[in-house]
Swiss-Prot record:
GO cellular component, one term: postsynaptic density membrane
Binding positions for L-glutamate per the UniProt entry: P518, T520, R525, A691, T692, E739
Glycan-linked positions: N70, N76, N278, N381, N415, N426, N433, N548, N551, N752
Protein name as annotated: Glutamate receptor ionotropic, kainate 3
Purpose of the protein: Ionotropic glutamate receptor that functions as a cation-permeable ligand-gated ion channel, gated by L-glutamate and the glutamatergic agonist kainic acid. Binding of the excitatory neurotransmitter L-glutamate induces a conformation change, leading to the opening of the cation channel, and thereby converts the chemical signal to an electrical impulse. The receptor then desensitizes rapidly and enters a transient inactive state, characterized by the presence of bound agonist.
Note: The postsynaptic actions of Glu are mediated by a variety of receptors that are named according to their selective agonists. This receptor binds domoate > kainate >> L-glutamate = quisqualate >> AMPA = NMDA.
Keyword field: Cell membrane, Disulfide bond, Glycoprotein, Ion channel, Ion transport, Isopeptide bond, Ligand-gated ion channel, Membrane, Phosphoprotein, Postsynaptic cell membrane, Receptor, Signal, Synapse, Transmembrane, Transmembrane helix, Transport, Ubl conjugation
GO terms for biological process, alphabetical: G protein-coupled glutamate receptor signaling pathway
Topological domains, Cytoplasmic: 585-636, 842-919
Protein's organism: Macaca fascicularis (Crab-eating macaque)
Its membrane topology: Multi-pass membrane protein
Transmembrane portions of the chain: 564-584, 637-657, 821-841
Amino acid sequence: MTAPWRRLRSLVWEYWAGLLVCAFWIPDSRGMPHVIRIGGIFEYADGPNAQVMNAEEHAFRFSANIINRNRTLLPNTTLTYDIQRIHFHDSFEATKKACDQLALGVVAIFGPSQGSCTNAVQSICNALEVPHIQLRWKHHPLDNKDTFYVNLYPDYASLSHAILDLVQYLKWRSATVVYDDSTGLIRLQELIMAPSRYNIRLKIRQLPVDSDDSRPLLKEMKRGREFRIIFDCSHTMAAQILKQAMAMGMMTEYYHFIFTTLDLYALDLEPYRYSGVNLTGFRILNVDNPHVSAIVEKWSMERLQAAPRAESGLLDGVMMTDAALLYDAVHIVSVCYQRAPQMTVNSLQCHRHKAWRFGGRFMNFIKEAQWEGLTGRIVFNKTSGLRTDFDLDIISLKEDGLEKVGVWSPADGLNITEVAKGRGPNVTDSLTNRSLIVTTVLEEPFVMFRKSDRTLYGNDRFEGYCIDLLKELAHILGFSYEIRLVEDGKYGAQDDKGQWNGMVKELIDHKADLAVAPLTITHVREKAIDFSKPFMTLGVSILYRKPNGTNPSVFSFLNPLSPDIWMYVLLAYLGVSCVLFVIARFSPYEWYDAHPCNPGSEVVENNFTLLNSFWFGMGSLMQQGSELMPKALSTRIIGGIWWFFTLIIISSYTANLAAFLTVERMESPIDSADDLAKQTKIEYGAVKDGATMTFFKKSKISTFEKMWAFMSSKPSALVKNNEEGIQRALTADYALLMESTTIEYVTQRNCNLTQIGGLIDSKGYGIGTPMGSPYRDKITIAILQLQEEDKLHIMKEKWWRGSGCPEEENKEASALGIQKIGGIFIVLAAGLVLSVLVAVGEFVYKLRKTAEREQRSFCSTVADEIRFSLTCQRRVKHKPQPPMMVKTDAVINMHTFNDRRLPGKDSMACSTSLAPVFP
C-alpha cells in the first residue's frame, strides 16, 4: 500500500472516529463527569537510576496529555492519572498501591509488568470488578476465571507460531533456541514441539542466570558450529548479546540470529550493518501509518528533551513497544468510557470487597472494542481478553539498516514481500567488494604451481582449471580472493569419531569462505557444508597400465573366423555333399556307360558315390579340384553354388588372416570392476580419505562391498594422493580407482596408462561453502551462466587437451561373424533348393521317355527307379533296353554323341556298329 493511500485512510479513519465519539457524547454530555481518573503502577530498580522515569510511565503521561489536548475524544472531560511506583517483584507493595488507587475512584489500572506483581493487582481488580490493563507477556492458565483484564501484548502462542513459520520459510534443518528464563520455554512451546512434526533438529540452551556475560555460551555455540540461533530475551539482553557476539567474531554472514523481542528495531545496530550477519526480528509498531509516524515523532522529541538515560545499546528517543502498547491502552479505555457515559465511579475499598456496579459493563465495552492504534489492529478475544489478531512486521538488517521484509498474521500466516524474495538477507551485495579466503588442494590439472623463471607470490603462484574458474566467478560477482592450500592436503573425510579433515574441516571452522577444487559432492559432505551446483560431471573409473602384446597360440589360425562361422561352414560342407550324392543318384543324366568304347554295355555307372561327393566338396573347399565333374544340370548347379560359396569363404578367411598375423593382439587381464573384484593378483585401491574411497566404503552393492573389503584389508591399497597412485600403476601391478576426469587428463599425457571399462557411478564437482553461507546461491547462478556461455567446456579443452599420445586406432582384428558373411549361406541354401527342383524335373522327364520306350506304365517305372536310387550302396545299374538295333555307322555316331562320352574317349576306334532292326 502506497504512502498517499495510507495517509488518506488515516484521515478518513480519524474523521469517522471523531463522528463516532461525538455520536456517543452529544446526547449524554451532561451526564459525563468532568474528570476521569486512571491509575498506573510502574516498577523501578534500586540504584542510581531508581528515580528516573521509565518509558512506560512517560508513555502513560504522554498518552493522557494527547487525549486532553484532543478535545474530540473527551470534549468536556479531563483525563487525570495517578502514578504509583513499586520495587521489582514486590507484590505486597503492588497490592497496597492498587488499593490506594481504587480508593481514588480509578476506572482502570494499568500495570505493573512483572509476573508476581501483575498477579497480585489482577486478583484485586477481579474481586472489585475493575478493568486491569496488562502490557507484558503473561502466562494465563487454561481454566482462566479472571475476566476483568485485557492484555495488549500479542498472544505468546501466536508469536511462537510466527517464529516457526519463519524458520520453515528459511528452510532451516537445525537451529538452537536460547532462552532467558523458564518462561521462555512456555512462550516457545509451538517451536519447541516442531521436531515431532517437522524435519528440524532443535538444541535448547539457557542464558547465564544473574549474569550479563554470555561469552562462555557464545563460545560453546561457536565451537559446536551452531550458526542458526533463536534468542528469546529482553531487548537489553539482546544488545549485550550482539556486542559480545561481535567480540567473539560471530557477527559474520554465516550466522543467522532471530530475536523474539519486539524491540529489536529500537537497538543501535549501526556497528553491525556491514558485518554481513543475518539478523531477523519482529516489530508490531505500525510505522507505515502516517498518523503513527506523527505520534512517534512527537514522542521522540519529548524523550530527547528529557534527562539522558544510562541504558546503552538503544537509539535515542525511540518509542519502545511497551510505550506504544501503553499509549494504545490509554486510548482504548478513554474511547470505551466515552461510549458508556452513564457510568459513575465510586471510591472502592479493598477490605469491603464491594465491587464496582458498572465494572462488568465497562469490561465488556473494552473487550468488544476495535482500535487501529500505534501497534496496528487491536482486537481482543471476548473470553480470554488476549490479543490474538494482530500484524507482525518481519524486519531484517541490511547494509542500509533495518528493513521490513515481510508480514505475519494469525489469519494469513507469513507473507514475504517480493523485494525480500529478490534480495534475501545480505545476499545481493554480499560478494561485491568482499575479500574471500579460498582453500584448495594441488591436483593436476585443476590446481598446479605455475612454472616461471621468476619468483611468484600470492595468487600468481597457481594455475589450472579451478584457478580459471575462480577468476571467472570473481569477475562476474565482483569479489577478490586469496588462495590458500589446505594444510593436510586432503579433500575432506569423516573419521569414526565424526571429525572432519581437509578442506571440509576448514569450511566448517570458517577458516575459508570457499573451497574451489575437484571436490566431489556427496550426501555425507552435504550434511557438514553447502555445495554449489556442479561445474563438472564425472564418475569413478579404473586407471591401469596398457597391456603388453600377447604371443599367438598354436591354433591362432582359427581366429579369422568366429566359432559360429566354422561350425556353419562344416554343416554347409556336410549338407552340400549329401545333397549332391542324393541328386546325383536321382538324376538320370549322372548315369553313363562305364566304357565309352562299348556302347552296347547293359550297365551304367554313377561316379558320385557318398565318399566321392564328400571328396568333391572338400576339393572345391580347398580350391584344388577332385577330377569329378558333374554332368547333369542339377548337379552342376550344386557345384557352381558350392564353388561360389568357397570362393567367398576362402577370400574372407585369407583377408582376415592377414590382419591377425600383422596386428599384435593387446589383451588386458581386467575389463571392468567385476574383474577386479573376482581376482586378487592385481592390487587396487583409491586415494585415502577421498570421495572415491568413501563411495566404496558406504556402498551397499555386493561387488563394491567386496572391493572395499579388499582395500581395507591391505593398508598398501590406499594411496596418499593421485600422484602416488599413478606412479604405482606405472611401476607395479596396481589399478587405481579415481575420477574419470583425472584419468582422462593422465592418459592424455602418459601413453602407458589407459582407462579400463566405463564409469562405475555418476557424480559432480562443486564449490564448497560453509553451512548456511549466503554465497552459495550467487555462485551457483554464476556457474550456470558460465555453462550457458560454454566457457566451462572451453576451459576444460584448454587444460585437458594433451600433445603426447596420438589418437589410438583400433588395432585389434575381430573374427568374422555371421553378421558379416551370413548372406553367402543364404545363397548356398537357395542354390541347393534350385538344384533339387531341377533334379526332380530331370528325373520325371527321363522316366517318362523310358516308360514310353519300354512300353511300361509311368508309375511302375518311377517306383523301380526310386527303389534303385534308394539303394545307396550300388553305383551301377542296367541300362534301359532300346528296340532291336542294327549296326550302322550313322547310328553309332548318333549314339556316341547322345551318351556324352568322357573327354578323350571320342577318338577311340570302334570296330563294330549297330543298326536298328525294325520288326
